[in-house]
Amino acid sequence: MDPVKAQQLAAELEVEMMADMYNSLLRMTGACHKKCVPPHYKEAELSKGESVCLDRCVSKYLDIHERMGKKLTELSLQDEELMKKMQQGVTST
């Protein structure tokens, strides 16, 4: 692959990854806020219960996100190995 095209592709993938991370952060923030903070609140500060709820919600969300990332990486590596084996099988015939 042309080095310039490879750099462009890497830059595009980085922008896409950053957008995905931002969207994931927005989803997490919205979901945890909806779950833990009542729609009509009277105080500007979070209550202890709301704070604990948000902490747990974010912790769970990040844990699941990490687990999914590891699993997707594992599956991606398996796919790469399978593709290499298939290419070796095609080139050896």
UniProtKB/Swiss-Prot annotation:
A motif (Twin CX3C motif) lies at residues 32-57. It is a peripheral membrane protein. Keywords: Chaperone, Disulfide bond, Membrane, Metal-binding, Mitochondrion, Mitochondrion inner membrane, Protein transport, Translocation, Transport, Zinc. One of its GO terms (biological process) is protein insertion into mitochondrial inner membrane. It comes from the Eukaryota. InterPro entries: Tim10-like, Tim10-like_dom_sf. It is found in: Mitochondrion inner membrane. GO terms for molecular function: metal ion binding. Pfam families: zf-Tim10_DDP. One of its GO terms (cellular component) is mitochondrial inner membrane. Disulfide bonds join 32-57, 36-53. The twin CX3C motif contains 4 conserved Cys residues that form 2 disulfide bonds in the mitochondrial intermembrane space. However, during the transit of TIMM10 from cytoplasm into mitochondrion, the Cys residues probably coordinate zinc, thereby preventing folding and allowing its transfer across mitochondrial outer membrane. Heterohexamer; composed of 3 copies of TIMM9 and 3 copies of TIMM10/TIM10A, named soluble 70 kDa complex. The complex forms a 6-bladed alpha-propeller structure and associates with the TIMM22 component of the TIM22 complex. Interacts with multi-pass transmembrane proteins in transit. Belongs to the small Tim family. Mitochondrial intermembrane chaperone that participates in the import and insertion of multi-pass transmembrane proteins into the mitochondrial inner membrane. May also be required for the transfer of beta-barrel precursors from the TOM complex to the sorting and assembly machinery (SAM complex) of the outer membrane. Acts as a chaperone-like protein that protects the hydrophobic precursors from aggregation and guide them through the mitochondrial intermembrane space. PANTHER family: MITOCHONDRIAL IMPORT INNER MEMBRANE TRANSLOCASE SUBUNIT TIM10. This is Mitochondrial import inner membrane translocase subunit Tim10-A.
